[in-house]
Every structure is written in structure tokens, then in C-alpha cells.
Amino acid sequence: NDCYYCGIRKSNSQVDRYRLTMDQILACADEGYVLGFRTFVLQGGEDGGFSDEAIADIVRCIKERYPDCAVTLSFGEHPYETYRLWRMAGADRYLLRHETADRVHYERLHPDSMSYDNRVRCLYDLKSLGYQVGSGFMVGSPYQTPVNLAEDLHFLAKLQPQMIGIGPYVPHKETPFAKMEQGTVRQTLVMISMLRLMFPKALIPSTTSLGTIAADGRERGFMHGANVVMPNLSPVSVRKKYELYDNKICTGEESAQCRGCLDRRAEAFGFQIVVDRGDYIS
């Protein structure tokens, strides 16, 4: 895709793109399992280099090797039958942010090749197939208004997702929005708080983007209602290549290998990190 806000958009020729092999992906899962993690997120672009069946095979392998673990996918927009194939292979969850619930705003953030209606169709297809569904939006994205944010809350109230991912918009120098203002910590924390009140049981991450624009952003996210942290299991050699926005943090503490660092930071704010499947409790 070629979303105008994304640092790894199709038109950015400066990106050092990569694919992980099946063996590399399974090695990451092996390492995560030893570290105590019981849920894995597989994320990538809408990449023709991976067939639908190839992704299904990866899901099957992880579920066969670690049947006590959850597998979450985030591979963008696909037909119903593709989502069904991956669900039958064992995928438990799917992350697909709606980004904005206002059609005109959506069209200002995306090229003509992308459709608001198709994005919404995907989310409802995923729900109908029994996935635990994650959606969400950027806070402070270009051209966003307070009315847009209210529409986002209304959209989520109708969708009733199990996971909600929001974070401040942070510009990337190789996008059409390079000179746009970034979102604010305060506005993001207000939206997290409102979502927690609306969705008492939802899985709401305190995102990397919050930690990027404020040193204590992630901790403040937890204080305002977030309850999920997502350590990075990607091979160290490729982590910096996944730069959705400028100055994305890629520190030791963001790494899955620094479990102790994460535990200590959480405990300092009165929290305890639980490493289980993290299923939504209905």
C-alpha cells in the first residue's frame, strides 16, 4: 500500500525492505517461547512474495509447535476467503486499524487505490470468522478534527473490537506528510482514557509511538488505561528497517530479550507484566 503517512509506503524508494524466511520466523517464536511469551504477532505488508498458503503454513507450524500460544496476524486487507484460510490454519487474532471513521478524511490520508468501504468490509469479515479483532486510529493525524475523533469512538462502539491500538501520529521524512505536525501525548492519553471507559475489558497497547515522542510515554499510557506492551522479537539485524515514522525507538528495553528491563519499569509504576496468551475476556 501507499498510505501517505507511512514511512514504509510503496513509493518510498529509500526503504531497505526485507522478508524473513520460515526458519527465521520459527526461530523468533522459539526464542520468545523460552522467554515466557505465549502470544506471537506476525506482521507484514501486503506482499506478493508470501502466498496466502505460505502464511497459513507459518501459522500451522507455530500452532503445532506451541499449541498453548495465540497467534495474531497483521497483513492488511484481503478477501474473505484468505482470512478464512488463515483462521482455519489456527490464527486467533487479527490487527487492522481503521485509521479514521470519516470517509473524506480517509481519502485525504490514502491514495485512490485504497477504499474506506473495503477497510470496513475487512473488519466485519474478520469478526464474522471468529477472530479476536483489533482496530484503532492515529491521534493527531493530518487534517484530523475533534469531530473525526468522535466518529472514531462511535465506529468502535459499533464494531466492538477486542483490541484497540491508538498512538500519536508521528511524521516520516520520506512521506507527503513529512512537514505535518505530530500528535500530542496529552491528546493520545485522553483518547486512551476514553476508550478504557468505553471498553473496560479491551486489550489496549501502550504504543511505541508514545514512547518515541515522550521518554515516559509508555508508562503514562498504562496510567491512563492501556494494558498491553508488545516487545519486539524480530531479528536484531532488521529491527531498524521497520521505520514507520522518524526516530522510532529501537532500544534494548523495547527488545523482547530485555524482559528484566520491562519488568523493572512496570514495577516502578505499580504494574506487573503477565506473559500469558492475553485472551480477551468476554
PLM features per residue range, with description:
Residues 3, 42, 96, 126, ...:
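Conserved, mostly hydrophobic/aromatic
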Residues 1-10:
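Local cysteine-cluster metal-coordination motifs and their immediate loop/turn environment
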Residues 29, 56-60, 83, 120-123, ...:
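Generic structural signal for well-ordered alpha-helices
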Residues 10-25, 32-53, 58-59, 63-123, ...:
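Core AdoMet radical
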Residues 79-88, 142-156, 211-224:
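Catalytic cores of alpha/beta
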Residues 132, 147-148, 203:
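Conserved mixed alpha/beta catalytic, RNA-binding, or beta-rich assembly cores of soluble enzyme
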Residues 33, 157-282:
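Auxiliary Fe-S-binding modules of radical SAM enzymes
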Residues 46-51, 112, 140-145, 177, ...:
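Short, small-residue-enriched loops and turns at beta-alpha junctions
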